[in-house]
Amino acid sequence: MTADGGPDVRHGTRPEPSGDGRVVVLSGPSAVGKSTVVRCLRERVPNLHFSVSATTRAPRPGEVDGVDYHFVSPARFQQLIDEGALLEWAEIHSGLHRSGTLAAPVRAAVARGCPVLIEVDLAGARAVKKAMPEALTVFLAPPSWEDLEARLIGRGTETPEVIARRLQTARVEMAAQHDFDRVVVNSRLESACAELVSLLVGTAPDRHDTSGRTGRQTTSHPD
């Protein structure tokens, strides 16, 4: 689940049984290029299942139910929580709305042997990993802190206050990157995407180190 703002409370559900499909959980700070990388992966992995979040907020102009989000009522979302139907969920903007990752579509894709990509924030990645220990968590990192600052400021879409808040959150996220199974440095889109494709389709080394994750790092070098 890609949150629209910082979650106030993050919740998970009971562990899910493993299957044949590989599940990659992608996270990283704002402006690191997650959306661009996700688009690349969806183009290159034809049978990829990209997890679409459920949310209680109203659709924005141009958003399509089932494509951008599964838009549900607060009552229905609570029912999903009660049924244990979410891998993770969060309360956004002090409980203004809730968003979460539906377990059933992920489970079905795994059963079909399809690779699954879930894009979530740091807390969401931890919750999914707890619910699905066999999932591979991947942190998409910038080449440097200065590069991340430049990307965030260069977008020109946020106020200085919002930028400062996002950078503060990014510092926390960057400090936690070695908690992930893999770290991919997004220096160049082509290399970062190729590395993630190999993780999704199973051509990369073992999913995770059962003796204790060290956050194996792969740097996408510029040409």
Swiss-Prot record:
<feature type="compositionally biased region" description="Basic and acidic residues">
    <location>
        <begin position="7"/>
        <end position="19"/>
    </location>
</feature>
<feature type="binding site">
    <location>
        <begin position="28"/>
        <end position="35"/>
    </location>
    <ligand>
        <name>ATP</name>
    </ligand>
</feature>
<protein>
    <recommendedName>
        <fullName>Guanylate kinase</fullName>
        <ecNumber>2.7.4.8</ecNumber>
    </recommendedName>
</protein>
<dbReference type="GO" id="GO:0005829">
    <property type="term" value="C:cytosol"/>
</dbReference>
<feature type="region of interest" description="Disordered">
    <location>
        <begin position="1"/>
        <end position="22"/>
    </location>
</feature>
<keyword id="KW-0963">Cytoplasm</keyword>
<keyword id="KW-0418">Kinase</keyword>
<dbReference type="InterPro" id="IPR020590">
    <property type="entry name" value="Guanylate_kinase_CS"/>
</dbReference>
<keyword id="KW-0547">Nucleotide-binding</keyword>
<comment type="function">
    <text>Essential for recycling GMP and indirectly, cGMP.</text>
</comment>
<dbReference type="GO" id="GO:0004385">
    <property type="term" value="F:guanylate kinase activity"/>
</dbReference>
<dbReference type="InterPro" id="IPR008144">
    <property type="entry name" value="Guanylate_kin-like_dom"/>
</dbReference>
<keyword id="KW-0808">Transferase</keyword>
<comment type="similarity">
    <text>Belongs to the guanylate kinase family.</text>
</comment>
<keyword id="KW-0067">ATP-binding</keyword>
<dbReference type="Pfam" id="PF00625">
    <property type="entry name" value="Guanylate_kin"/>
</dbReference>
<feature type="domain" description="Guanylate kinase-like">
    <location>
        <begin position="21"/>
        <end position="201"/>
    </location>
</feature>
<dbReference type="InterPro" id="IPR008145">
    <property type="entry name" value="GK/Ca_channel_bsu"/>
</dbReference>
<dbReference type="InterPro" id="IPR027417">
    <property type="entry name" value="P-loop_NTPase"/>
</dbReference>
<dbReference type="GO" id="GO:0005524">
    <property type="term" value="F:ATP binding"/>
</dbReference>
<feature type="region of interest" description="Disordered">
    <location>
        <begin position="204"/>
        <end position="223"/>
    </location>
</feature>
<dbReference type="InterPro" id="IPR017665">
    <property type="entry name" value="Guanylate_kinase"/>
</dbReference>
<feature type="compositionally biased region" description="Polar residues">
    <location>
        <begin position="212"/>
        <end position="223"/>
    </location>
</feature>
